[in-house]
Amino acid sequence: MQRGTLIFTAHCHPVHRFLHLIVVLAVILFGCYPASAQEFPKAADMVVNGQPIDIRGENYRQLFQELRDVHRFTQQELDTLFAGVAIDRKVLELMDKQWEAKPYYEYWPLFITPAVIATGKKKLKEHQALLDRIEAEIGVDREYVIAIWGIESRFGTNHGKYGVFKTLNPLFDAYPRRSKFFRNQLIQFLLLCRDNQIDPLQVKGSYAGAFGQTQFIPSSFQEYAVSFDGDQRRDVFGSIDDILASIANYLHSFKWVLDAPVYVDIGNRLRSAKLIQANLSGRKALVDWSEVTSAQGITLPRPPQDRGLTIVGLEIHPTEGGGFRYVAGYPNFQAITAWNNSNRYAMAVSELAEALNSGH
């Protein structure tokens, strides 16, 4: 067991030790975690804030070997970079309390406000020529590019306050559920910093390791960021051309279709078992356009290439009657969920884009 990952020691509360033993016994006897134990303990419960991460352990030994042998970092560079890395317990707590878990009526007001709408409309006018070019060359609707920019970084005014390198280390070391994912993000972050001559210790971002005005995670930057200002350098911190074009390029890479539908309301009740099951199964469960029109008794525009639709239930505030508002998410909606794996996020982007396109 690695030091810096689990603290099943004198630091661990006796109740935690007892519950941990129950979980271990369940795994031994039944080969799986009991349902009630899957949520306990959370990663933050198993560490002490500020405790040193053991970079001599097997996980870091393998990481350093890959960084040396595959990516040509020197041991001296690694020793300097990783000296003193430690657990930030707040990062682990935030990972388990993400906004996407809120009901939609609590979620959307976090992002769609009169101030955001007003600023977004100003940005549409300010960058009209650039957005014309983005639509012509990349093929993504301008309001959605601006909406994502507004939600991700408040149009560049909020890049995040966490050191990205200092954040990615505890997520790799002490967040077992996604350790493999954050290991890759840590590698990609070091590579992009080296390629762009950036000091890894100076980059600020979100608690999940996203950075810049796009709030790309490192692997997304590597794959989708583009230079659109002619300098051949991908700058998601200061170049508005690169920032907006990179957002558009991401959506384009997931088959965004210009001027195509994003979502359509289909009522407050689902009228077929297929639609109910699709809603319960999440964003990857697609249903045919004809099934939605037939079951709901409504007319819908056909999706591009007759691709499938996502069925999304959005919680209505109890003071407004409660229940759900259901929408059919089109392929463009699905492109937004490729950016952020959340139907609520995609809906907030869509409704903000609509507000930016309105005359009010």
Regions found by a protein language model. Name each.
Residues 86-89, 152-156, 210, 257, ...:
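Solvent-exposed loop/turn segments at secondary-structure junctions
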Residues 33-37:
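Sec/Tat signal peptide C-region and signal peptidase I cleavage site
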